[in-house]
């Protein structure tokens, strides 16, 4: 059993100055209990906390760290650029370089606007879709999380799912009035809502492959059906690749399921672990943005040169061999987890979206938010803590995705393999 004395002290101190002691709710361990670990350093696939405990990292900062932590090429790029200044509030060459890198990887994207977070990216894409179409209503799917702007928190996943809330206090009826929420993976529901409101709907926004109600991949043809329906009604399709973008393939989910959306949003991997994100799409739609057009969007730190350096270094190091390694590591990890749970007699499923996955307990297929919430989530805290105590750091919520990096090595997999039988038994013995 590892000690958490210093983490507990720091959490108490943080709670006196930061609401809940954390700056993103899932970090508080509310859904699994126990003391959040305060991390002091990371290298490769390993995290070290303030108490000196070391963990094999299966969260990867919620996705961005595909190359592992402190990758030499990324660190060198950040240090080199930071030495010349941290922020200028003026254009820099690296902004265009990163935009071009995205355009080269995702064929439908012809123009890119850089922002600071995934929330900004989706919020701005929604505003642009409304400005382009002159319509007000948007369609989103239950359990899909697109950041914490008011209109998009209606029946969202991620931290809202972890907290068991259908939405969030503070989101007014007026803010959500034009948000139409449908069950995920249900083409008939989309067709019905367009039959009713088609000439009022500006856009449909969907996660390319959801990872915020757990990993729940789209059924075959679902995203293509969204493209067909939106095009038929003059609405835009926004595909949110903040999580999947440049993680599940060189071209993100688009590389696995090439549906030509009007707008895409990106984050996480494209910034190499620093705060940056983007949205992009066709030249026609993106041309409505200020200063070319009337749809306003701006940001003091957008295109920050240090974040651009981290993103460019990450994407340029993520070659075909890196993506093959990510897939192989996910295959190996999923196999180990599945074998351990089967051996312990725990009914489970491990849905995949490329090299992302989640662990659901129970036998009914998970295809949407309702079926995700119907799983035996009460088994997850025991499973989580058994792994954590053995030096493995999984996501502290049953509704989050697990992430691998290229840095996972044989020693890390041996440690995981040693920890899993006990964790599986803990899940088997958990009480509802």
From Swiss-Prot:
Domain of life from the UniProt record: Bacteria
Pathway assigned in UniProt: Porphyrin-containing compound metabolism; protoporphyrin-IX biosynthesis; 5-aminolevulinate from L-glutamyl-tRNA(Glu): step 2/2
Pfam families according to UniProt: Aminotran_3
GO biological process: protoporphyrinogen IX biosynthetic process
Compartments, as annotated in UniProt: Cytoplasm
Catalytic activity: (S)-4-amino-5-oxopentanoate = 5-aminolevulinate
Main location (coarse class): cytoplasm
Cofactor: pyridoxal 5'-phosphate
Keywords on record: Cytoplasm, Isomerase, Porphyrin biosynthesis, Pyridoxal phosphate
Residue pairs linked by disulfide bridges in the UniProt entry: none
GO MF, one annotated term: glutamate-1-semialdehyde 2,1-aminomutase activity
UniProt entry tagged with the keyword Isomerase: yes
InterPro entries named in the record: 4pyrrol_synth_GluAld_NH2Trfase, Aminotrans_3, Aminotrans_3_PPA_site, PyrdxlP-dep_Trfase, PyrdxlP-dep_Trfase_major, PyrdxlP-dep_Trfase_small
Subunit structure: Homodimer.
Family label: Belongs to the class-III pyridoxal-phosphate-dependent aminotransferase family. HemL subfamily.
Protein name (Swiss-Prot/TrEMBL): Glutamate-1-semialdehyde 2,1-aminomutase
Taxonomic placement: Bacteria, Bacillati, Actinomycetota, Actinomycetes, Mycobacteriales
Gene name for this UniProt entry: hemL
């Amino acid at each position: 059993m590892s000690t958490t004395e210093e983490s507990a002290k720091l959490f108490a101190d943080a709670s006196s100055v930061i609401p809940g002691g954390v700056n993103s709710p899932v970090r508080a361990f509310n859904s699994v209990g126990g003391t959040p670990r305060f991390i002091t350093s990371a290298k490769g696939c390993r995290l070290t906390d303030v108490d000196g405990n070391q963990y094999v990292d299966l969260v990867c900062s919620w996705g961005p760290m595909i190359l592992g932590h402190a990758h030499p090429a990324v660190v060198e790029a950040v240090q080199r650029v930071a030495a010349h200044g941290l922020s200028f509030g003026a254009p820099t060459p690296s902004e265009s370089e990163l935009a071009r890198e995205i355009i080269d990887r995702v064929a439908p994207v012809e123009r890119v606007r850089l922002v600071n977070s995934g929330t900004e990216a989706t919020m701005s894409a929604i505003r642009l879709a409304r400005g382009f179409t002159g319509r007000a209503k948007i369609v989103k799917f239950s359990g899909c999380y697109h950041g914490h702007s008011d209109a998009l928190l209606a029946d969202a996943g991620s931290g809202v799912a972890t907290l068991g809330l259908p939405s969030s206090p503070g989101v007014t009826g007026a803010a959500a009035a034009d948000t139409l929420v449908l069950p995920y993976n249900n083409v008939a529901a989309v067709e019905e809502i367009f039959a009713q409101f088609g000439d009022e709907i500006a856009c449909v926004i969907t996660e390319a492959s959801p990872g915020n109600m757990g990993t729940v991949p789209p059924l075959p043809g679902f995203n293509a059906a969204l493209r067909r329906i939106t095009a038929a009604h003059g609405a835009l399709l926004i595909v949110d690749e903040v999580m999947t973008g440049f993680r599940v393939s060189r071209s993100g989910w688009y590389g696995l399921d090439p549906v030509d959306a009007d707008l895409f949003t990106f984050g996480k991997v494209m910034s190499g672990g620093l705060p940056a994100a983007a949205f992009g799409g066709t030249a026609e739609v993106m041309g409505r943005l200020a200063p070319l057009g009337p749809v306003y969007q701006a940001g003091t730190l957008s295109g920050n040169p240090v974040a651009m350096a981290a993103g460019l270094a990450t994407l340029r190091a993520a070659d075909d061999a890196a993506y093959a390694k990510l897939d192989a590591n996910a295959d190996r990890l999923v196999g180990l987890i599945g074998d351990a749970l089967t051996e312990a007699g725990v009914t489970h499923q491990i849905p995949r979206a490329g090299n992302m996955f989640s662990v659901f307990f129970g036998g009914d297929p998970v295809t949407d938010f309702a079926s995700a919430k119907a799983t035996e989530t009460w088994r997850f805290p025991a499973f989580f803590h058994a792994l954590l105590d053995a030096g493995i750091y999984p996501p502290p919520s049953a509704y989050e995705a697990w992430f691998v990096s290229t840095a996972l090595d044989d020693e890390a997999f041996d440690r995981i393999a040693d920890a899993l039988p006990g964790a599986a038994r803990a899940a088997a013995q958990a009480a509802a």
